[in-house]
Structure formats: structure tokens, C-alpha cells
Amino acid sequence: MTEKMTRMTQFVKEEIANAITHGIGAILSIPALIILIIHASKHGTASAVVAFTVYGVSMFLLYLFSTLLHSIHHPKVEKLFTILDHSAIYLLIAGTYTPFLLITLRGPLGWTLLAIIWTLAIGGIIFKIFFVRRFIKASTLCYIIMGWLIIVAIKPLYENLTGHGFSLLLAGGILYSVGAIFFLWEKLPFNHAIWHLFVLGGSAMMFFCVLFYVLPTAS
């Protein structure tokens, strides 16, 4: 009984940490979304507003669904929140791609990659609906591969984002990828909360890259 209580206590502590870390992300995502929309409205076209909105909303949903999953434990909603949480990862990946592909790259390459990424994201969401608690390692690998598909357009991205913007993009990708190691490291105490911190860091890098370099004020 003591061992069981110890495990339960540790579980509660870790879930509190998980909820707090991404709860902070959910709160910060609200002003981030507002800033993105205002910035795109002032300095971009209608397509920029759409792209920035899609990105901002996808970021907010990821943190919202994650916070709900780790905050509310009830048999009737746990599976639903798990599906929403895992699906939101696909949404964030595709949502993050959207401003880079619609604004930074544009043209045939941008539209082609956009179609591919959103098709993969939709396929991943459908997969999660049926297999949300299975193939976790394979799903994590899929997230990473999707995130790094942008490497096929590395040259035009670097040229358009400049060195500083590209550095932020690269830093964000690295933080997301390194964080996945902790996500899979289940024996490490608070591994999930540590992963959440890497996700927050990756989101911050991507946000500032989109805000300052995808649609510079000077343009």
C-alpha cells in the first residue's frame, strides 16, 4: 500500500507540474495570438492575417488541450482530452509551417509543401482518433520528421529570413527535437514537465521568428 501511495503521490506531483508548465503556455498564447493578428493586419496582406491567425490558434490549442489533459482526470473525458492533446501536436506543426510557406516561400514550392504538411497533419489526427494510446514512439518520430521536412527548402528560407531569423527557426526546431528525448524518457522523474519546458522554448523561438522575420515591419 505504501508503494502504491508513493507512486500516486509522485503521479499527482508530476501532473501538477505538467499542467502548470503548459498552463503558462496557454496563458501566454492568448496575447501572442493577438500580437500576431495585429502585426499581420498592419504590415501584411489578408493571406498574412490568415497565416498568422492559423499559427497563433494552433499554438493556443496545443497548450489548452495539454493543460486540460493534465488537469482533469475523469474516465468520461480522459480519452477525448488525450486525442485532442495528441492531435494538437499535428496542428501546431502544420500551423507553424503555414506562415513560413505562405509568406516566406510562397510560389509553387510553398504551396506544395503546405499541401503536404497539412495532409500529413490531417492523416495524423485521424490516426490518433483510432490509435491514441498506441505507437507512441512511431508517432513521436513522425512529429520530428514532419518538423524537419522544411529542410528541403533550407536555401530559400535562409535567404528570406536572413541569418538571425534562420537561427531562431533552427533553435526552435532543435529545442522541439531535443525535448522529444525527454518525452520518451519515461523513467526520468518529471520527464513530461521537462519536455513541456522544451516545447515552451521551441514555441518562443518560432514565435519571435514569425513575428520579426517572416513579416518584417520594414516590408
Swiss-Prot record:
Is Transmembrane among this UniProt entry's keywords? yes
The cross-references to InterPro entries, in alphabetical order and at most eight, read: AdipoR/HlyIII-related, Hy-lIII
Which terms under GO biological process does the entry name?
A: killing of cells of another organism
Membrane topology label? Multi-pass membrane protein
Q: Which residues cross the membrane?
A: 19-39, 49-69, 83-103, 112-132, 138-158, 165-185, 194-214
Instruction: Spell out the Pfam families in the cross-references.
Output: HlyIII
Its annotated compartments are:
Cell membrane
List the keywords (alphabetical).
Cell membrane, Cytolysis, Hemolysis, Membrane, Toxin, Transmembrane, Transmembrane helix, Virulence
Q: In its keyword annotation, does this UniProt entry include Transferase? A: no
Q: What are the protein's GO molecular function terms?
A: pore-forming activity; toxin activity
The record's Gene Ontology cellular component field reads: plasma membrane
The task this protein performs is described as:
Might be virulent against a mammalian host; when expressed in E.coli, the soluble extract has hemolytic activity on human erythrocytes. The activity is not inhibited by cholesterol or activated by 2-mercaptoethanol. Might be pore-forming protein. Its in vivo role in virulence is untested, nor has it been shown to be secreted by B.cereus.
Family statement: Belongs to the UPF0073 (Hly-III) family.
**Protein name (record):** Hemolysin-3
Q: In which organism is this protein found?
A: Bacillus cereus
Q: What is the lineage of its organism?
A: Bacteria, Bacillati, Bacillota, Bacilli, Bacillales
Source gene?
Answer: hly-III
